[in-house]
From Swiss-Prot:
Any single Gene Ontology cellular-component annotation: preribosome, small subunit precursor
Domain of life: Eukaryota
GO BP annotations, alphabetical order: endonucleolytic cleavage in 5'-ETS of tricistronic rRNA transcript (SSU-rRNA, 5.8S rRNA, LSU-rRNA); endonucleolytic cleavage in ITS1 to separate SSU-rRNA from 5.8S rRNA and LSU-rRNA from tricistronic rRNA transcript (SSU-rRNA, 5.8S rRNA, LSU-rRNA); endonucleolytic cleavage to generate mature 5'-end of SSU-rRNA from (SSU-rRNA, 5.8S rRNA, LSU-rRNA); positive regulation of transcription by RNA polymerase I
Source organism: Candida glabrata (strain ATCC 2001 / BCRC 20586 / JCM 3761 / NBRC 0622 / NRRL Y-65 / CBS 138) (Yeast)
Record's function text: Involved in nucleolar processing of pre-18S ribosomal RNA. Involved in ribosome biosynthesis.
Keyword Ribonucleoprotein (UniProt): yes
InterPro entries, sorted: ARM-like, ARM-type_fold, BP28_C_dom, HEAT_type_2, HEAT_Utp10/HEAT1, U3snoRNP10_N, UTP10
Record family assignment: Belongs to the HEATR1/UTP10 family.
Keyword Iron-sulfur: no
Protein name per its UniProtKB record: U3 small nucleolar RNA-associated protein 10
Gene: UTP10
Signal peptide range in chain numbering: none
Keywords: Membrane, Nucleus, Repeat, Ribonucleoprotein, Ribosome biogenesis, rRNA processing, Transmembrane, Transmembrane helix
Membrane-crossing residue ranges in chain numbering: 499-519, 528-548
């Protein structure tokens, strides 16, 4: 039985869509996949259904299977279906239909119709409530799409989907890691696996879903990759899913299964039986060819996970058959070729082993398979051993020959080891296979086997049947019996091979060799020639050859002694070439036999040996004897190389020709190859004998197939054979037939032969004549144009050592333009002709042009790689080729960029090679071709390389500089410098550094104009050059051109760009131009920079004069630097340009914060370092002084001549729009810019040089405005810099003393300011007399001078006071009274300079306070007035002076003066600022005054305090302002009181009480009693807050006056809410801070209690709470005294009677409530007296009173009583 919670959950689920109220129904109805809730809530079912029906029809058009739902879920009756009233069975059917629909629609969620159709199921059947799981599962693979986020928003997530809840809250799509975590949940994984199984079963899987499933499983495996336990748990789940996917028949499903299995087995290697089962399942279910590749690699990769020997066991027969059914061996090879990087050795080893075991018909497939694989050693060994075992049982062993030849070639040692492990030797195995296999021989094994063979024992240990008789063997093979004396050397290869096979078989069977030979060859000649052929046959095993040697030795003895056996020598020589020592010994033995015979003229078989009628050209008997004996004597068995004894020196030529002829005569390829090798080793240069091979070589290609077939039949390597033939090509080859052979081979389709030829050509090509080289190269180039090239023509050419002349010939022969088109130097580059263009449009001609381009490109690649020695002819041909490329590009539209880049590289290499050879001059270089190519090329790389060519040519040909530099630099400025790459930058720099020096040297007469043109070319492109590359480029340019001539023009051009940027409000661009210019100038010496400034000013002066004078403008128009645009500017535009340019130069010179941290770009620091460096020579200093002076003079001249220079000729047409005022403003700006430039130029000088330069400029002969600015510059200089030479500053002050009286007011003011600054900074070092002189001058000026001079003079006096101190006292009467007078004059004045004058006077008094405070006592009132009423001075400044006053002056005097100033000035002023400053000074004084002084001055202070209290009645300020003032006064008073003791303060407090209550000591008749009492109680309350219980006893002086005042409030004699509140608060505070039972005194209590409680009778509602608090505090303090409690209770009851007013009763109730809440326990005894009153109040007519009693008082009493109050009422 299920638990109660489960039952409740089921009920809740079934009723999830049941809504019992309107809101819930609306919420259910508003859940939508498409619409927002508000819109969805307004829709009816009919509208939703109609929309869904249309969507379903669209789905049916896509997938007809949806039609079934039109009769169920989307039928007309579905509108009326309500699952809440249906039966359980009906709902089950409905859910099944919905689930089926969701399975089908899951692949269509990306389509709008699916969304609109499903909307009906959500709205009508609430599938988001009842079918949540299937809805989420079917859409989970869309988790990153908006639709899934929408579904999450409307469903209630089941428990297994809870990880998605966070994304519902955040309204975002789930992340990948969340999905992984969900799948990592075991329950969810099983749930989704079941769902996937349903999808597979119903064939509703689709690509997107399978991709999602695959990714999820892969991520799940990766997530648990380090958790083996989890992976083990996943095994059955994943295998089950994979099996179902594989069994589905869907290609996508199978590919998904393959992928999952690959990843899973890689993470967790499975047992072999599982792997085998998985492979069988994969292959068994493979039906669609689309899945074949995936299945193949799945099988491969799953097998790779197996470990150990079991991994390579042969495949089971059933799996092999299935695999073989799906994959032919050709298909397997193709798949392995497609993915060569994938390891597949384990499965393929198993597959090969299965093939060896089960399918012998496919043994031919083993070799190509093994070639494709990278097998481990143990895998290779397994295959070899299987094949060795197979050789025992396989009848047709010829199938294994090629296979074992390959295996031996791959790893001979391993094969031999495998044989040894099976107790077999290589020699025995060769006999078994009837072929020769091994190059490594074992001499002992050979001899042992030979003995065995000679002893006629059976060598075949594997024979199980009895050997058949030889006679039977002979009869079976009687057709191969030879009865003639014909030579077997010339016998047909197939017949010989058959006889050889029979011979091996016979020997292997155990028949006697002699028996076989005599039986199958009846003549001696046949037997001997057969054996000779055996010993030179590569297919014959070593043991057989040894046996043949023995028999040859025997047969020789049977030959007539008169026959010369020298004809056998070639075969013996070839036979000894192997590695077998025994074979060599046998050869030497036979040679000995031959040498012991007579050397007659009758040679054995001389006309039969190589064929009937073929005479053998043999040496004379004497030569043959000499050769034989020489060879035997010098032949060493251990020697591998016999070339040293191959041809004797005595008859070298004879035997050289003899052996060469043998190659031609012997009809066997292997001996031919071996003899050629012997010849090649002896004579590397084959020219001496290669002529003999003319016929053979000439016909070689025709006979090649026949020769290669013979090689195959004789088991001769065709590559080695052809290599030997090709090696006949000699160094310096001259034979035409050989050259024809080379050409014919290159034209052939024989790739292997061509490669052999190429390898030989690489060795000998360099020795060929140029004509022969040219012929070969032309042929190779011709093959380039073929679509299907047999060999790598480019690689071939690049590997050949081609000489420069050959390249020249090639380029000339492949030229399009005739030399007459391009060699006529005075002509410019020909233009593109329409004729060429039309011709190249032809398809045939176009193809020829493409082939031509391809050839040239190949040659250029070759030339670029080989780096051949350069020559002028080669360079010239490259120029012609460049012209051809331009024709192909411009006229033919062919892609020549790559070829041009190669050509440029080749030209560079050639030029550099010529330079290395010492060449210094080139003639007739066509620079215009390069320039044209640069201009027309669209490739920056080509352009850059051609620019490098220009640079390299610059030093070898002045012609290029003279005729081409301008277009080159124009191009660089327009294009190259704009490229943002390092290579282009380096190219441009290198071009500049190489071309410019040559250019300057060639144009010494007109150098300035040319320099300006080049600078303009680059400066014009400045804004287009990447910012990080500008500096290096322009630095290189200026250095190359020379800074003296180029820096000024460059500054001029940059200043124009700066002006344009400023006018266009491009602030960042203008700032970057200034920064760039600074950085550029920092790369040059200071002298160079100053020269550049001078040139800049000179150029602008020319512009100014040209704008003024039309004749000079015409002159400038010829200069490249002054474009017509600048010269034709309107007057206002030119003024703007001039102003901005001067401003630009100023900013360049002036240092900024960035310059502070980088001294290299700080012009000022670098100038200092030269001027102040003692190591700098005088000549350098002098040159610098002259340059700097010239710049300064030019600026001063411009300023002085300003009115004349800046009067322009007005062009009426262009100046109509410019008003006179506008031009005047611009001219004024120019003037100020010039002054700014002057200031910048002067400011960078060291102070001593600066003064030496500027002081003379103050002479009166100079314009006063200039003097003014010079004086300002001097002032700024001293302000910003420190001077160590104090004599210098004194002299300056002295000079100023003399100059000031003579100057105009504005200049004199600046000089006075300068004097003030100097005295402030260096006055302490000045002589006292000098300061007296200054004071005399200044004191005179303050009384007689104008205001500005008065201000500056006072500043001078102020600084003198600071320096002189008390010594100033003699000037005190002269200065201070006048300053006070000046202040009084300006106090009410509205002069413009009044604030500055007030400030200067205030600062003077500040200095006096600091320096001579004691002398200021008499003028203290004036000082305070100055502080309080200097309205033009900032308040903060005056506050600082106040602080200084409180620190420096005697505070007793200050306090007395404050009282006087208050009464005399401040209180009557009505100036809030003055009052605020007065209070600040008072506060500061009180805070800093000592207690002793405070005690002595306390009467004075309290007198001032009373005056301040009375200010309320005298002021016209608003109440808030007065309150703030009084608050400050109370704070000050409290601070002062804290400095007094009780003995001093009590009398003063009594005075205050009498003033407040009795009016004693009142100084203002206008103040009222209420105001006095208000002021007092505010002060007293603040005092109580600060002093707390210390002054509780002081209430003794107040208790009676307060009692009287309370009574007056009761009687109504006085009425003031604020005063009453203050009074009540004072009582509360006193009660609060009472720590000495002061208020428990009966006398005080009985005095104050009635008056206080009776306040209830007429208390104002606004302050009732203060009264309640006061009474409550009094009750709390006296709660321990019963009599006091009774008294207060009685008084309170009187105010709670029915006859009392409602307000009175209300506050009385609240008071009682507060008392009971505080001290209820003490008042419980009084409760019976209170009950009747409370009962009455509970029935009170006033609701507020009743509510307060019922809700407040009664509840408080109940809390105290601990029981309901109703009990007392009952």
């Amino acid at each position: 039985m299920s638990s109660l919670s489960d039952q409740l959950a089921q009920v809740a689920a079934s009723n999830a869509s049941v809504a019992f109220d309107r809101k819930k129904r609306q919420k259910l109805h508003s859940a939508s996949l498409i619409y927002n809730p508000k819109t969805a809530a307004t829709q009816d079912y009919e509208t939703i259904f109609e929309n869904a029906l249309g969507a379903l029809q669209e789905l049916c058009d896509i997938e007809p299977r949806f039609q079934v739902f039109s009769k169920t879920l989307f039928s007309e009756t579905s509108i009326t279906i309500d699952r809440n009233v249906q039966s359980k069975e009906e709902n089950k059917n409905l859910d099944n239909a919905i689930n089926a629909y969701l399975l089908m629609v899951s692949s269509k969620w990306h389509l709008a119709p699916a969304l609109h159709a499903t909307e009906w199921l959500v709205r009508r059947f609430q599938i988001h409530v009842h079918n949540t799981e299937i809805l989420l599962l079917s859409t989970l693979n869309y988790y990153q799409s908006p639709i899934f986020k929408r579904i999450l928003n409307i469903v209630k997530l089941p428990a297994l989907f809870q990880p998605l809840s966070n994304f519902v809250k955040n309204d975002s799509n789930p992340t990948n890691i969340t999905i992984i975590k969900m799948f990592n949940d075991t329950d969810f994984l099983k749930l989704y696996s079941n769902y996937l199984s349903k999808c597979i079963k119903h064939k509703s899987t689709y690509t997107n879903q399978l991709l999602f499933v695959t990714c999820c499983f892969i991520n799940l495996i990766a997530f648990n990759s380090s958790n083996d336990e989890k992976l083990e748990f996943l095994v059955p789940i994943i295998l089950e899913i994979a099996a179902k996917l594989l069994a589905s028949g869907s290609t996508d499903c199978q590919i998904a299964a393959h992928t999952i299995l690959i990843v899973f087995t890689a993470a967790l290697p499975l047992k072999k039986d599982i792997v085998v089962a998985a492979i069988e399942t994969i292959l068994a279910n493979l039906k669609d060819k689309k899945a074949e590749q995936s299945a193949f690699w799945a099988v491969i990769k799953i097998s790779q996970t197996l470990k150990g020997q079991q991994a390579i066991e042969h495949l089971p027969a059933n799996i092999y058959k299935i695999f073989d059914k799906h994959y032919t061996w050709v298909r397997v090879l193709d798949l392995l070729t497609e993915e060569p990087s994938i390891k597949c050795d384990k499965f393929m080893t198993s597959y090969i082993r299965a093939m060896i075991r089960f399918d012998h018909s496919k043994l031919d497939m083993v070799v190509p398979l093994v070639q494709k694989l990278s097998l481990e050693k143990y895998e290779f060994r397994s295959i070899v051993i299987d094949l060795i075992h197979l050789s025992e049982v396989l009848e047709d062993k010829s199938k294994l020959i090629d296979l074992f030849e390959f295996l031996v070639k791959e790893n001979e040692s391993l094969v031999i080891n495998c044989l040894s492990s099976l107790n077999l030797t290589g020699e025995m195995f060769e006999i078994r296979l009837t072929t020769s296999l091994f190059s490594k021989t074992n001499d002992d094994n050979e001899l042992e086997l030979l003995k065995t063979l000679n002893s006629h024992k059976n060598t075949s240990s594997d024979k199980k049947e009895e050997t058949k008789p030889f006679k039977q063997f002979l009869e079976e093979n009687s057709e191969f019996i030879v009865t003639s004396n014909k030579s077997m050397i010339s016998e047909d290869d197939e017949k010989f091979n058959k006889i050889l096979g029979l011979f091996i078989e016979a020997i292997g069977t155990g028949y006697q060799a002699g028996l076989f030979l005599s039986s199958f060859m009846t003549t001696l000649e046949a037997r001997l020639t057969f054996l000779l052929r055996v010993i030179v046959s590569p297919s014959a095993p070593i043991a057989l050859r040894l046996l043949a040697m023995n028999n040859i030795s025997k047969y020789i003895q049977s030959i007539d002694k008169e026959l010369n056996l020298f004809t056998l020598i070639p075969f013996l020589l070839v036979a000894q070439s192997g590695s077998s020592k025994n074979l060599k010994i046998s050869v030497k033995k036979i040679l000995g036999q031959i040498g012991n015979r007579p050397f007659t003229k009758h040679y054995f078989m001389s006309n039969q040996l190589y064929g009937e009628g073929k005479d053998i050209k043999v040496p004379s008997p004497s030569d043959s004897e000499m050769w034989t004996k020489n060879f035997i004597e010098n032949y060493v068995v251990e020697n591998v190389d016999i070339s040293g004894v191959f041809i004797p020196k005595q008859a070298e030529k004879v035997f050289l020709l003899f052996w060469a002829q043998q190659v031609l005569d012997i009809p066997l390829p292997y001996p031919q190859y071996m003899i050629l090798n012997f010849l090649g080793k002896y004579v590397p240069n084959t020219a001496s004998y290669s002529g003999l091979f003319e016929e053979s070589i000439s016909s070689y290609l025709e006979r090649r197939e026949e020769l290669l077939l013979r090689c195959a039949l004789n088991k001769t390597d065709p590559i080695q054979f052809e290599t030997a033939m090709v090696n006949l090509i000699s160094n310096k080859e001259k034979h035409h037939f050989m050259l024809d052979f080379i050409i014919n081979v290159l034209q052939s389709d024989y790739e292997d032969l061509i490669q052999i030829l190429v390898d030989r050509l690489v060795e000998v090509f360099a020795t060929f004549k140029t004509s022969n080289q040219l012929r070969i190269v032309q042929e190779i180039l011709q093959s380039v144009t073929k679509e299907d090239q047999i060999y790598d023509a480019l690689g071939t050419l690049q590997s050949l050592q081609i000489d420069p002349d050959t390249f020249v010939c090639i380029f000339k022969e492949n030229s399009i333009n005739s030399e007459s088109d391009v060699t006529s130097f005075p002509k410019r580059r020909r233009r593109r002709s329409s004729t060429n263009k039309a011709a190249l449009q032809s398809a045939e001609v176009s193809q020829i042009a493409e082939d031509h381009l391809k050839k040239l490109t190949i040659m250029l690649e070759t030339l670029d790689k080989q780096k051949v020695k350069g020559s002028e002819e080669l360079l010239s041909s490259l120029f012609f080729t460049l012209a051809d490329f331009e024709t192909l590009d411009q006229d033919g539209g062919l892609p020549v960029l790559y070829a041009e880049e190669l050509l440029a590289s080749a030209m560079l290499n050639t030029i550099r090679s010529l330079k290395d050879q010492g060449l210094t001059q080139l003639q007739n270089v066509r620079a215009d071709i390069i320039v044209s190519a640069i201009r027309t090329s669209s490739s920056p790389q080509v352009q850059n390389k051609l620019l490098l060519v220009i640079g390299e040519l610059a030093t070898l040909s002045s012609e290029i500089v003279l005729h081409s530099v301008m277009p080159i630099f124009t191009f660089m400025g327009a294009h190259s410098v704009r490229q943002d790459d390092e290579f282009t930058t380096q190219v441009v720099e290198k071009t500049i550094l190489t071309v410019v020096p040559a250019f300057l040297a060639a144009n010494s007469e007109n150098i300035t104009e040319e320099i300006e043109f080049l600078v303009m070319s680059f400066a014009t492109a400045l804004q287009h050059i990447p910012k990080h590359r500008r500096l290096r480029l322009f630095t290189t340019l200026v250095q190359a051109l020379g800074s003296d001539n180029s820096l000024g023009p460059l500054l001029l051009l940059i200043s124009q760009q700066y002006s344009n940027a400023v006018k266009s409000f491009k602030i960042s661009e203008s700032r970057s131009l200034v920064e760039f210019t600074k950085l550029l100038l920092s790369k040059f010496e200071v002298q160079e920079q100053i020269t550049g400034f001078r040139k800049f000013l000179e150029l602008y002066e020319k512009l100014l004069l040209a704008n003024k004078n039309p004749e000079k403008k015409v002159t400038l128009e010829t200069q490249a630097l002054f474009s017509s645009k600048i010269l034709n500017l309107t007057q206002s535009e030119f003024c703007d340009l001039t102003n901005n340019s001067y401003d630009f130069l100023t900013k360049v010179i002036v240092d900024t914060n960035d310059d502070y941290y980088d001294s290299s770009r700080n012009f000022k620091i670098r100038l200092y370092s030269i001027i102040l460096d003692p190591t700098v020579s005088n000549a350098t200093r002098k040159a610098l002084d002259e340059s700097y002076s010239s710049v300064l003079k030019m600026i001063l001249s411009l300023i002085a001549d300003y009115p004349d220079i800046f009067v322009f000729e007005t062009n009426e047409n262009s100046e109509k729009q410019n008003s006179v005022h506008f031009i005047g403003d611009i001219l004024e700006e120019i003037k100020q810019s010039l002054y700014g430039l002057l200031h910048a130029i002067l400011d960078v000088l060291p102070i001593n040089v600066f003064l030496t330069t500027t002081v003379p400029l103050l002479e009166s002969s100079i314009d006063k405005e200039i003097r003014y600015h010079i004086a300002s510059n001097i002032f700024d200089k001293f302000e910003n810099e420190t001077v160590d030479d104090h004599e210098l500053t004194q002299s300056v002050v002295h000079t100023l003393n003399e100059k000031i009286p003579q100057e105009e007011n504005n200049v004199a003011q600046v000089l006075l300011n300068l004097q003030s600054s100097l005295i402030n900074k260096y006055g302490s070092f000045f002589d006292n007399n000098l300061l007296v002189e200054v004071l005399n001058l200044a004191s005179g000026l303050i009384s007689t001078g104008p205001r500005e001079l008065q201000i500056s003079s006072i500043a001078v006096i102020t600084n003198c006071v600071s320096v002189m101190g008390v010594k100033f006292i003699s000037f005190y009467p002269k200065v201070v009274p006048i300053c006070i007078k000046l202040f009084n004059e300006t106090r009410a004045s509205k002069e413009e300079l009044a604030p500055q004058l007030q400030l200067s006077i205030l600062l003077l008094f500040t200095a006096l306070v600091k320096s001579i405070p004691s002398f200021l006592t008499s003028d203290l009132i004036s000082l305070m007035k100055l502080i309080f009423f200097s309205s033009g001075v900032e308040v903060t400044t005056r506050l600082s002076v106040i602080q200084l006053v409180t620190e420096k002056l005697d505070l007793k005097n200050v306090l007395g003066t404050l009282l006087k100033v208050w009464n005399s000035e401040v209180k009557e002023s009505g100036d809030s600022t003055a009052i605020s400053l007065f209070l600040s000074l008072l506060e500061g004084t009180v805070e800093k005054i000592e207690k002793k002084s405070a005690t002595s001055q306390s009467p004075l202070f309290f007198k001032l305090l009373i005056c301040l209290f009375e200010f309320r009645s005298q002021s016209e300020f608003d109440t808030n302002t007065i309150s703030r003032i009084e608050s400050s006064v109370y704070a000050v008073a409290n601070t002062y009181v804290l400095k007094l003791n009780d003995k001093v303060f009590r009398p003063l407090f009594v005075i205050l009480i009498k003033w407040a209550f009795d009016g004693e000591g009142v100084s203002s008749e206008s103040i009222t009693e209420k105001e006095r009492l208000t002021a007092f109680f505010k002060f007293f309350n603040r005092l109580q807050e600060n002093l707390k219980g210390i002054i509780t006893s002081y209430f003794t002086y107040l208790i009676e006056p307060v009692n009287e005042l309370l009574k007056r409030f009761i009687s109504g004699d006085i009425s003031d809410v604020n005063l009453r509140r203050l009074l009540l608060n004072s009582l509360t505070s006193s009660l609060k801070y009472d720590r000495d039972e002061y208020w428990q005194s009966t006398s005080r209590f009985e005095l104050i209690c009635p008056s206080l409680v009776n306040q209830l009778s007429n208390i104002e509602p606004t302050i009732g709470k203060y009264l309640v608090k006061a009474i409550g505090s009094l009750a709390a303090k006296n709660s321990s005294v019963d009599e006091h409690n009774q008294m207060m209770n009685k008084l309170l009851v009187e105010h709670m009677k029915a006859t009392c007013s409602s307000n009175e009763k209300l506050w009385a109730v609240r008071t009682v409530k507060l008392i009971y809440s505080k001290v209820g326990e003490s008042w419980l005894v009084l409760l019976p007296q209170m009950v009747p009153i409370i009962a009455e109040l509970l029935e009170d007519d006033n609701e507020e009173v009743e509510s307060e009693v019922r809700g407040g008082l009664v509840r408080v009493m109940e809390n105290v009583l601990g029981e309901p109050f109703d009990r007392y009422l009952d």
